[in-house]
């Protein structure tokens, strides 16, 4: 009898075993914290992430033949970007005494300190916790920092609901075993605020398998999630948090009286990918349905349980929930979530168009007080020459005891400001070389983002934060030379394909692919409503102008009205972009044409007809002219 061999069972990834053996995120981290080594082993590093820290190697300081320059990055978990004045002061002090003298606002509304050494790590985390902060769950295979619009409007109740539920969802999905407090605070649990009773009840409520038979971690169990998990809560129309990029996005739905009714639900977003691995990809979230406010915790637990139980624990490159939706399809995913939830989704509610907002400058809160949005280029709070942002911000926080809200575009909002303090606050920033008028900031800089990358991020293959200012400056010079001086384009850059600065949603995305080389993505929208696509696989930085000059010229010639560059690229398509670029000859310096370039004048009427036909047929003007001349001369 011939039998068909059965496939060998798939082996869980190495990290799954590390989590399972960790005793709920304790070991080997707790033991290794006590030794004299200046680093943790690979197994301990995996557990350290759950506690909000990454082990890094400063490659600028690395000496050939010597051991790595080990140091640690610490990241806060603060839903909705809230940083009380007391916490900011403590973080600023830590960065001076035990860090690299800077702070970094993240693209998930947290703060990072870089440069902490291992022997100071316990003290640093304890300092954060004792000053109204936390790092628990800021990293690792767990629900990360829950995002919400940072704007502190007091007269728009939907914003209050977004903040409230960002906090409650974060509490619902916070680890429960107590390992964090045992390791970093010797077992003393410090609580900055009481957990809402409905959150406690929701955590213990077992629907249809949402909870595991595990009293220590009823939602996560001892292996937690297959990979990182990201959630946002926003309000209709406000896309300051990149709504399509999360595992779950909840959209607050209110009635005409401003009372909360429920939430629209999107799921399956995620941007991380790997170069040359086509099975990995960026994905925008899908609308799933609507739930009433009474069902929102059940909904969140049902989606988490679906990913927990069906997400890929064998291949970490395929472990994010976006791949589950891609493999299953939205309908199968929706039905599984409904099975856990015990009831069907209602229909997705109509929404207005999404709009990116950065809230820079001065705004009324709606309660008689003001808030002020401060641009932080690439999120780095630092002092450098005459630019003394770190000093100025500390003076303002100390003098006025203002809380901060960090934005998803790594900027800062100071709020609860008395109107009479506005002039004094502006003066402090201006005296320290900080621009306070958002209209004075180049829009390329204002709307750009970059990840930290080199020298500290272990995944970076090239520069990002340190090179982005010069890239934006070169793009601006090029636009100016082409008589496009006021053009606003969303640019984003990462030093690797993991997508921390969300380059795949930008109009122009630079994704590090090799030293000083970038994959270029085009076609995202100014309001981050769709994914861009890879236009070229590897652009050396020295070829920046030669790549973008023909694209900008084509854009100038063939755009429709005030069409954005990203919308233009999406409309005409990459074939047309490449054809135009291939046939483009740049004018010689000094305004003289190259020998092989000829000019033919057209009447205004003929040019208008040519442009109209180009827009109607979605065809470049030079291609229409070429075809017409070929036909005419061939007679």
UniProtKB/Swiss-Prot annotation:
It comes from the Bacteria. Gene3D superfamilies: Sulfite Reductase Hemoprotein, domain 1 (3.30.413.10). It catalyses: hydrogen sulfide + 6 oxidized [2Fe-2S]-[ferredoxin] + 3 H2O = sulfite + 6 reduced [2Fe-2S]-[ferredoxin] + 7 H(+). Siroheme binds at residue 500. GO terms for biological process: sulfate assimilation. Catalyzes the reduction of sulfite to sulfide, a step in the biosynthesis of sulfur-containing amino acids and cofactors. This is Sulfite reductase [ferredoxin].
């Amino acid at each position: 009898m011939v039998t068909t061999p059965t496939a060998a069972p798939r082996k869980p990834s190495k990290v799954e075993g590390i989590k399972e053996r960790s005793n709920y995120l304790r070991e080997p981290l707790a033991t290794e914290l006590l030794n004299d080594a200046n680093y943790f082993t690979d197994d301990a590093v995996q557990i350290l992430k759950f506690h909000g820290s990454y082990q890094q190697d400063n490659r600028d300081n690395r000496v050939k033949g010597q051991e790595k320059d080990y140091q640690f990055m610490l990241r806060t978990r603060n839903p909705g970007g809230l940083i009380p004045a007391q916490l900011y002061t403590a973080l600023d002090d830590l960065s001076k005494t035990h860090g690299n003298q800077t702070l970094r606002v993240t693209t998930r509304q947290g703060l990072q300190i870089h440069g902490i050494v291992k022997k100071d790590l316990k003290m640093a985390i304890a300092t954060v916790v004792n000053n109204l902060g936390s790092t628990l769950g800021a990293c690792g295979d767990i629900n990360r920092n829950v995002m919400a619009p940072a704007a502190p409007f007091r007269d728009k109740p939907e914003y209050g609901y977004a903040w409230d539920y960002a906090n409650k969802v974060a509490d619902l999905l916070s680890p429960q075993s107590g390992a964090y407090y045992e390791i970093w605070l010797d077992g003393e649990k410090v609580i900055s605020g009481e957990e809402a009773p409905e959150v406690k009840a929701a955590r213990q409520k077992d629907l249809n398998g949402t909870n595991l038979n595990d009293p220590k971690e009823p939602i996560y169990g001892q292996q937690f999630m297959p990979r990182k998990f990201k959630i946002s809560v926003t309000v209709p129309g406000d896309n300051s948090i990149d709504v399509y990029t999360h595992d779950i996005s909840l959209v607050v739905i209110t009635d005409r009286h401003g009372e909360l009714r429920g939430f629209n639900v999107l799921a399956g977003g995620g941007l991380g990918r790997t170069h040359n691995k086509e099975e990995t990809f960026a994905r925008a979230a899908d609308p799933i349905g609507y739930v009433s406010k009474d069902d929102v915790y059940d909904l969140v637990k049902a989606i988490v349980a679906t990913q927990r139980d069906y997400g890929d624990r064998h291949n970490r490159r395929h472990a994010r929930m976006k791949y589950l939706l891609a493999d299953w399809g939205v309908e199968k995913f929706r039905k599984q979530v409904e099975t856990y939830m015990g009831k069907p989704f209602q229909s997705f509610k109509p929404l207005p168009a999404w709009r990116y907002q950065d809230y820079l400058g001065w705004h009324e809160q709606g309660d008689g007080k003001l808030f002020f949005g401060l641009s932080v280029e690439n999120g780095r709070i630092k002092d450098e020459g005459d630019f003394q942002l770190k000093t100025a911000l500390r003076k303002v926080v100390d003098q006025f005891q203002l809380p901060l809200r960090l934005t998803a575009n790594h900027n800062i909002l100071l709020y609860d400001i008395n109107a009479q303090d506005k002039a004094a606050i502006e003066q402090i920033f201006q005296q320290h070389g900080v621009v306070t008028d958002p209209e004075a900031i180049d829009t390329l800089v204002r709307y750009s983002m970059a990840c930290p990358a080199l020298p500290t991020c272990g995944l970076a293959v090239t520069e990002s934060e340190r090179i982005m200012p010069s890239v934006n400056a070169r793009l601006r010079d090029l636009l100016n030379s082409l008589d496009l001086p006021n053009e606003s384009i969303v640019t984003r850059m990462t030093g690797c394909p993991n997508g921390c600065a969300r380059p795949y949603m930008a109009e122009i995305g630079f994704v590090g692919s090799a030293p000083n080389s970038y994959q270029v993505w085009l076609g995202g929208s100014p309001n981050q409503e769709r994914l861009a696509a890879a236009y070229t696989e590897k652009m050396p930085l020295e070829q920046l102008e030669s790549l973008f000059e023909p694209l900008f010229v084509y854009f100038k010639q063939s755009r429709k009205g005030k069409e954005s560059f990203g919308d233009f690229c999406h409309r005409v398509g990459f074939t047309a972009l490449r054809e135009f670029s291939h046939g483009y000859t740049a004018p010689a310096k000094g305004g003289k044409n190259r020998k092989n370039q000829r000019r033919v004048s057209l009447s205004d009427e003929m040019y208008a007809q040519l442009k109209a036909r180009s827009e109607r047929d979605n065809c470049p003007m030079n291609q229409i002219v070429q075809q017409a001349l070929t036909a005419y001369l061939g007679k």
